[in-house]
């Protein structure tokens, strides 16, 4: 489960529904739950994590929620009963697994619960630690401690005015720490979300060892370590290779450096890069005046894929060796100042793209990022052109290294039309809101633009770019399979979602269909589903498991998710038999409303072909899903009224249908009664701006 960072209404509705269902489930289990804390936990995953997956809770998420987000965001006033953050999180985790909303790529339930146990010991101390509080929470509690009624807006305003005049006592040290943490980015914050990635297809590691072994860089680094050996080679007092050894090594490694007339190994750039690379990859080290092979690196040197991967990660530390100034007479380019960040963004841009990136588009996108990072207005047009050309040469050098090691491949060809559809001429005028339709991950390069450029100049740049892309073949850049694997590993390491076709082969049916519905395009969904079915051998049994998963999800009162699961099953079912599957479910006691809705949405079933009873089933299903999309009971009344006066008759007709979700229809009846001002028994309704769950006045403060 994931909602886009800007889709606040959709998230709020989904959060309301989840909390409503959670409280009902917990009540049935006899398990206490704090609805406000549960809402705050979901807020954390949506707003403050890079992937935003509500159903995936790794130990790092558990720890950050309990020891950082709750202390920062959840305000508990003096005399108020504290909320049970760890207990609520345990209940939420059990609920997600029980109703099959847990992400199949996350840890097992026991692993997540163990992380809660580990953090719980420190939770009370963290909640009381003012250094961890948010700024608004700090002042709210300070006001409450001094007798201010924080629910009285006027009283709180008077307190704020006194604080500004220096008439309020407060913990200056704690406030300084809070401000320092905010300024240095050491707090979980809103807006941490990164763009989702498309699923990728990769060979097995055993297959990838062959291209890794063929990598020029792997061969050179291995040879360098073997040359250094266990006995080591003498180096100068500055830690550099002696010139005689450097000449020998140039020949051994085939670096192509010209040694004639060179007096220092420092003047052999390609050799210097490889030596520094081997150091950063922990393959060699300098100690006591000698260059040694690292003994612990022997297993890495023996495995080409491990060696290649270590070299790839070390590349992010090679800024000076790769593009640094060679002497005091030279200066670094703009790329030097943002090297590691730009390398990451460029690779993320190339990752999972369905077609190769044209060099001119990538180059100009990087230029936009430079404009965001640097004040370029002071330079003349000629000087700016020189700055960009210098940075372009360094970017080329970076790509040369990526090509040599086998992470990137280049070819000549026509740019895909997708790269002609996005007008970047006004990109510098955009703030955090970037233009829609950018190639996936290209937003990472653009970031937040700086001051607006001359619109005419920007349009002229875009015109020149289009001419360049359409005039003929251009250089096209894409990641190799090795490069894709390496970038994916880095994405996963920082918590980003990077789906891999085949990774769901052991997933439970509900987890499989949920992931396919949310993250996979039709082609990769078909491939993933085919692999899942193949692993079970019995196709008929596999279909029963999948349809049972949809049936269970519908029974758990998550009908919109059940609909999405059935839809993706129909689209991805092998041999194009999805329509036959839906028609077979037309008479299913539980799934008929979902199947009929799917057939109707695809224009595979006309209104004339449906019976009166089926019309009522589809009508009832649409209303039940409307209630869910509105956030459950909390927002459904307004949603029903928004449908207009004919909605009364529609609800009345739906209530007379044979829809299998009788509990849902009963809830719909009560919601409709409240929506149109008649008396009814209230059911559910735990989330909302007015609370009835004993949250004790706790507020989120940002």
Predicted regions and their residues:
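Hydrophobic, helix-prone linear segments
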Residues: 1-44, 48-49, 295-348, 354
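N-terminal core-binding DNA-recognition domain of tyrosine recombinases/integrases
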Residues: 20-127
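Short, amphipathic alpha-helical interface elements at domain boundaries
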Residues: 34-55, 59-71, 164-273, 291, ...
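Extended, non-catalytic subsegments within catalytic or DNA/protein-binding/adaptor domains
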Residues: 100-164
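Accessory beta->alpha helical hairpin/"wing" motif in late/C-terminal subdomains of nucleic-acid enzymes
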Residues: 103-118, 272-274, 281, 285-333, ...
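Charge-dense, extended regions
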Residues: 138-141, 145, 152-181, 651-657, ...
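Long, compositionally biased intrinsically disordered terminal regions
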Residues: 212, 414-578, 589-685
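Short Lys/Arg-rich cationic patches that frequently serve as NLS/NoLS or arginine-rich RNA/DNA-binding motifs
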Residues: 680-702
